[in-house]
Amino acid sequence: MRRGDVFIADLIPRSGSEQTGRRPVVIISNDGFNLTQNWRSIIVVPLSTSTSQALRTQTAVMIPQGEAGLSQDSVALCHQVTTLDRSKLKNRLGELTQAKMLEIERGLKAAMDLI
C-alpha cells in the first residue's frame, strides 16, 4: 500500500457528518509509514459519489469514473482527512495519477489553511 493508492475501506464507526460505511479512500500518508508493517495507522481522504460536493468548496477534488479503478465519478473530501487502522482497508482499486495527487495536496492545504 502506497501514497495515492485507492482502497475500499470500512469507515465504521463514525458519527455526525463524517463519511461512513464501506467506501473508497485514497491513501495520503508518507510511504515510509505505509510500507512499515508494524505501523498500523494510515492517513486517508474519503471519497464520495455525491459530485455536487465538488462545487461547494476548494477542498473537494473531482475524480472521474475509471481513474484508479473507480466505478463512478467521485469526489475526494480533503476536509474530512482521517486516520484508520490498516485492517480497515479491504481491497485495492488502483492508483491515482501524480497530477490528481497534486490536486488533492492543494485541497488538503486549503482545508488546513497551509496555503
What is the meaning of each model-derived region?
Residues 1-115:
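Conserved functional hotspots at enzyme active or ligand-binding sites that engage polyanionic ligands
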